[in-house]
A protein has these predicted regions:
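Bacterial N-terminal signal peptides that target proteins for export
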Residues: 2-13
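Gram-negative bacterial Sec-dependent N-terminal signal peptides
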Residues: 16-17
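Active-site nucleophile-His-acid catalytic modules used for acyl/amide transfer and hydrolysis
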Residues: 90-150
């Protein structure tokens, strides 16, 4: 989903400042913070979403995250394992106005759910940014993240060959415009404050 130029500029500035932040060490990571995975090379997800972020995880304990990942579904992962993944790095995002404890508890309700590789709003499987969207609430229990129209097209507006083939194998049309989320767009929401790079 395309963003306004001013929003893109603000996000780029935030991204640069976060990447340059030298004081943002692991001990500053709080329960309820989000970890956005920034890749070094474009892939089939970043090709159709704004920015180079292709995954998001939730800090669920001092040295642990909860995340939805392909083949495994919603799982708990040691923080060191996350940090040691080869490609790219992680940015810490703090959700302003969130009830962090309750939001993490909500995420735990999805533990063991399958991974939604089709990126559809189904109750029996879930993908990474959908976990965040469904789990995060404010102090009054109100959801903090709404959905957006899903995008499977590139900058020219053309649905990419990858996604055409992917959904064709499942006997489906590409769910362009269906309600959903993506990690890159989530990172640009006004209620997300990028705190720096996970080290």
């Amino acid at each position: 989903m395309a963003s306004s130029l001013s929003m893109e500029r603000k996000w780029c500035v935030s991204l640069v400042l976060a990447a340059l932040c030298s004081g943002c060490a692991t001990q500053q990571l709080r329960v309820g913070d989000l970890l956005f995975h920034v890749v070094g090379q474009e892939n089939h997800i970043t090709e159709v979403t704004p920015g180079m972020i292709d995954h998001v995880a939730i800090c669920s304990a001092k040295n642990q995250v909860i995340e939805a990942i392909p083949h495994s579904g919603v799982v708990l992962t040691p923080l060191d394992s996350v940090k040691n993944r080869e490609d790219g790095y992680y940015l810490i995002g703090r959700v302003k106005g969130a009830d962090a404890k309750r939001s993490v508890e909500n995420a735990f309700h999805f533990l063991g759910a399958g991974y939604d590789s089709l990126f559809l709003p189904t109750p029996d499987a879930i993908y990474c940014s959908e976990l965040v969207q469904l789990a995060y609430v404010d102090k009054k229990g109100r959801q903090l993240f709404g959905t957006i129209p899903m995008s499977f097209h590139d900058a020219s507006g053309r649905i990419t060959d990858y996604w055409m083939r992917f959904y064709s194998r499942h006997g489906m049309e590409v769910p362009e415009g269906q309600p959903g989320t993506n990690p890159s767009e989530l990172s640009k929401r006004k209620i997300i404050k990028l705190k720096g790079r996970l080290r």
